[in-house]
C-alpha cells in the first residue's frame, strides 16, 4: 500500500481508470469511412459521420468481434444482449449533438486483470465494464487567431471504453495496469495501443482518504497520453487534494486536465452526472444480440495471451518469471524468441536476447521486426557458443557482424577464421610458452598470489588471438601451475 505523506499524517490513494482504446478496424463503428491515421483533414468523412439529415448508422460487425475478443481476454462476461444509447451533449466537433455509446446495457461486464505490486505479489483489479462507443472529431484552435477549425476524420471511429473499479492503490499500480492492458490488446489485435497517436487514452478518477474512512470526493483527470504522465498526474492530483483537505477545504467534484510541461492539473469543467447527458436508447439501432456460437468461435480463435506465454516459458523453457515477462512484454519479441528457442538452449538464448540483441536494437532505434538477424541464425550463434565452437568473446564479434550484415554465424566464422581452439595439445604448447616466458610470475603464483592466475589466462588468450577455449585454458593452466 502506497501513501501520500501529508502534514497531519498518511493518506491513501483511491484510483479508478477509464481507458479509451481505438478499435483496430479499417472502417468506423457506424460507417464505411476509412480510419487511416494522419490523413488530410476531413478526407475520411461520410454523410453518416457528418450527421447529414436522413443518414442512418450501420453497425460494424468487426468492431463487435474485437470487443468480444477483448472481453474474453479480460476473463469477463459477454452480454448476449446489449443496447446502444445516445449520450446527449453539445460540442463543435460532435456533429450529431450526441455520442452513440452503451450506458445501460454494455457488451462486456465483470472482468479482471492481475497486476504485479511493489511487494512482488499479484493484485486483482476488477473491471466494471467494457462498452462500445464512437469517437468525436477534433477541434484545432492554433490554425488561426480568429477561427477554430474542425477535423471530422476521427468522428465515428470505434472505441472500447474499459472501466475499472476503484481498486488501484498507487500511481505505479495504475501504470502497471495500463501497460498490461495495452499489451493484452496488442496480442489480441483489438487495439495498437499507440498512446502517442491517441489510439489509447487514459482518464483517471482520483480521491484520497484516511485509512478505514469512506471514499472521498473524486476528480477525473482527462486524456492522459503516456505511462509516465499517468504516474505524474495521479501524484500531483492526490497531493493537491491532501493539501486542500488538511487546510480545511472541500474537494469539488470536477473534471481536470493534466499539463505535461508543468506537471500540474487544472480545472476543465465541473464533473457531470449521468442525468446531465439524458441517456436514452438510440432509435436508429436495434439491440445487439450475440449468440453462444459466435462467442465460442471467437474464443477458439484467440491467440496465446501474455499470461499464458509467461506460464509456458517458465514451465517448458525453465525461464525465470522476470525473464519471461521481459520477453512477453513485446509480442514481436515473443514470436522471435519462440522461433529461435526451438533450435537452441532457451536460457542461453534469453541471456543473449535481452543483453546483446536488445542493446543493439536500442542503439539502432529499431524494432526486432527490422533486425537483419533471423531467429534461425540467432539460434545457430547460441549453439556455437554452447558446443564450444566459439568463445563468448568471439561470439560478440560475430554477433556484431551478424547485426550489420544479416550473415549466418558459421559463414562469418569461416571467413574470419574465428573457430575456438579446443585442442589440448595446441593449448598445452601455448601454456608452456607463457610459463617459460614468465618465471617470476609463476613463482609468485605458487607462493600464494592467486590473483596472478588471471594474468596467465590473459597471456594465453593474447597468444591465441582470443580463440582459446577459456574453460579448457583454466583447467590446463591450473594443472600446469600446480605441478
Curated annotation (Swiss-Prot):
Example of a GO MF term: asparaginyl-tRNA synthase (glutamine-hydrolyzing) activity
Keyword Ligase: yes
Enzyme Commission number(s) of this protein: 6.3.5.-
Origin: domain of life: Bacteria
Catalytic activity: L-glutamyl-tRNA(Gln) + L-glutamine + ATP + H2O = L-glutaminyl-tRNA(Gln) + L-glutamate + ADP + phosphate + H(+); L-aspartyl-tRNA(Asn) + L-glutamine + ATP + H2O = L-asparaginyl-tRNA(Asn) + L-glutamate + ADP + phosphate + 2 H(+)
UniProt family annotation: Belongs to the GatB/GatE family. GatB subfamily.
Record's protein name: Aspartyl/glutamyl-tRNA(Asn/Gln) amidotransferase subunit B
Species whose genome carries this gene: Rickettsia rickettsii (strain Iowa)
Function: Allows the formation of correctly charged Asn-tRNA(Asn) or Gln-tRNA(Gln) through the transamidation of misacylated Asp-tRNA(Asn) or Glu-tRNA(Gln) in organisms which lack either or both of asparaginyl-tRNA or glutaminyl-tRNA synthetases. The reaction takes place in the presence of glutamine and ATP through an activated phospho-Asp-tRNA(Asn) or phospho-Glu-tRNA(Gln).
Any one GO BP annotation for this protein: translation
Cross-referenced InterPro entries: Asn/Gln-tRNA_amidoTrfase_suB/E, Asn/Gln-tRNA_Trfase_suB/E_cat, Asn/Gln_amidotransferase, Asn/Gln_tRNA_amidoTrase-B-like, GatB, GatB_C_1, GatB_Yqey_C_2, Gln-tRNA_amidoTrfase_suB_CS
Taxonomic lineage: Bacteria, Pseudomonadati, Pseudomonadota, Alphaproteobacteria, Rickettsiales
UniProt subunit comment: Heterotrimer of A, B and C subunits.
UniProt keyword ATP-binding present: yes
Enzymatic class: ligase
Keywords: ATP-binding, Ligase, Nucleotide-binding, Protein biosynthesis
Primary gene name: gatB
Amino acid at each position: 500500500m502506497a501513501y501520500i505523506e501529508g502534514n497531519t499524517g498518511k493518506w491513501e490513494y483511491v484510483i479508478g481508470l477509464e481507458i479509451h482504446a481505438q478499435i483496430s478496424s479499417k472502417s468506423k463503428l457506424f460507417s464505411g469511412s476509412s480510419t487511416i491515421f494522419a490523413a488530410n483533414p476531413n478526407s475520411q468523412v461520410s454523410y453518416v459521420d457528418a450527421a447529414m439529415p436522413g443518414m442512418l448508422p450501420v453497425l460494424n460487425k468487426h468492431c463487435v468481434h474485437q470487443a468480444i475478443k477483448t472481453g474474453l481476454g479480460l476473463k469477463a462476461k459477454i452480454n448476449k444482449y446489449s443496447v446502444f444509447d445516445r449520450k446527449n451533449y453539445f460540442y463543435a466537433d460532435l456533429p450529431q449533438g450526441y455520442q452513440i455509446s452503451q450506458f445501460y446495457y454494455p457488451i462486456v461486464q465483470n472482468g479482471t486483470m492481475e497486476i504485479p505490486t511493489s511487494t512482488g505479489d499479484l493484485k486483482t483489479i476488477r473491471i466494471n465494464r467494457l462498452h462500445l462507443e464512437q469517437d468525436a472529431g477534433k477541434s484545432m484552435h492554433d490554425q488561426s487567431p480568429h477561427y477554430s477549425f474542425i477535423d471530422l476524420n476521427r468522428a465515428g471511429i470505434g472505441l472500447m471504453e474499459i472501466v475499472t473499479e476503484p481498486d488501484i492503490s498507487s500511481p505505479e499500480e495504475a501504470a502497471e495496469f495500463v501497460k498490461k492492458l495495452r499489451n493484452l490488446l496488442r496480442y489480441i489485435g483489438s487495439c495498437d495501443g499507440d498512446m502517442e497517436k491517441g489510439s489509447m487514452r487514459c482518464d483517471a478518477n482520483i480521491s484520497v482518504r484516511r485509512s478505514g474512512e469512506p471514499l472521498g470526493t473524486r476528480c477525473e483527470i482527462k486524456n492522459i497520453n503516456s505511462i509516465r504522465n499517468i504516474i505524474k498526474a495521479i501524484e500531483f492530483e492526490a497531493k493537491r487534494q491532501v493539501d486542500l483537505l488538511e487546510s480545511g477545504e472541500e474537494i469539488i467534484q470536477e473534471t481536470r486536465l493534466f499539463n505535461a510541461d508543468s506537471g500540474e492539473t487544472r480545472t476543465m469543467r465541473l464533473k457531470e452526472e449521468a442525468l446531465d447527458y439524458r441517456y436514452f436508447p438510440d432509435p436508429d439501432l436495434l439491440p445487439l444480440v450475440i449468440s453462444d456460437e459466435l462467442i465460442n468461435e471467437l474464443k477458439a480463435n484467440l491467440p496465446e495471451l501474455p499470461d499464458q506465454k509467461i506460464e509456458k516459458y517458465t514451465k517448458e523453457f525453465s525461464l525465470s518469471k522476470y525473464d519471461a515477462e521481459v520477453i512477453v512484454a513485446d509480442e514481436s519479441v515473443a514470436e522471435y524468441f519462440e522461433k529461435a528457442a526451438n533450435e537452441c538452449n532457451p536460457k542461453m538464448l534469453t541471456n543473449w536476447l535481452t543483453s546483446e540483441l536488445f542493446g543493439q536494437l536500442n542503439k539502432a532505434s529499431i524494432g526486432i521486426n527490422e533486425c537483419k538477424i533471423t531467429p534461425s541464425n540467432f539460434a545457430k550463434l547460441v549453439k556455437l557458443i554452447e558446443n564450444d565452437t566459439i568463445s563468448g568473446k568471439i561470439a560478440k564479434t560475430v554477433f556484431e557482424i551478424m547485426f550489420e550484415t544479416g550473415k549466418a554465424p558459421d559463414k562469418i566464422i569461416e571467413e574470419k577464421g574465428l573457430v575456438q581452439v579446443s585442442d589440448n595439445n595446441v593449448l598445452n604448447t601455448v601454456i608452456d610458452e607463457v610459463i617459460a616466458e614468465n618465471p617470476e610470475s609463476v613463482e609468485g603464483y605458487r607462493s600464494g598470489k592467486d590473483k596472478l592466475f588471471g594474468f596467465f589466462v590473459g597471456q594465453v588468450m593474447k597468444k591465441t588471438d582470443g580463440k582459446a577455449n577459456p574453460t579448457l585454458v583454466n583447467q590446463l593452466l591450473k594443472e600446469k601451475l600446480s605441478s
